[in-house]
């Protein structure tokens, strides 16, 4: 559950905090592409691995991320992650708004789910919907689990208002180099 929260936080919370068990929903399957982050996508300002989606018409977006700072960046297994963000919300974000999240571990899709933006925004930042247009600055801290399998995770999050209005699309790639525990020399 904490890793799902991390995935949400790294891609969606910075966007939807204002608008409002990792392995609990497996959806294994092969993908034609492992890169959800395109080299032509626009990087979101700040200390973070996030970009706006390359194949997304940002002219129709109603949520603009001014910056996201992750502390530490990159995130570390078994440590706290603090997320600082400023978002410009250009439309009223309604109850029933949602984000579709896809997470790939290499070629394998391990998460493919729809989350309620308002529920998550309230859970993580005490933000209630509907959220009126404006600039919102927030900070949140989450605890990452130690047992994050090593490798590269590719995350894609597309968000829509309850009426189907496009909010935004964000992608990110994060690598973890170990499970978060140290090997102990048992020869002594």
Curated annotation (Swiss-Prot):
Keywords of this entry: Lipid transport, Signal, Transport
Pfam families hit by this protein: E1_DerP2_DerF2
GO annotation, cellular component aspect: fungal-type vacuole lumen
Gene Ontology molecular function terms on file: sterol binding
GO-annotated biological processes: intracellular sterol transport; membrane organization; sterol transport
Signal sequence range: 1-19
Keyword Endoplasmic reticulum assigned: no
InterPro entries, alphabetized: Ig_E-set, ML_dom, ML_PG-PI_TP, NPC2-like
Residue ranges annotated as propeptide in the record: 20-40
Record's subunit section: Monomer.
Family: Belongs to the NPC2 family.
Record's function text: Catalyzes the intermembrane transfer of phosphatidylglycerol and phosphatidylinositol.
Protein name: Phosphatidylglycerol/phosphatidylinositol transfer protein
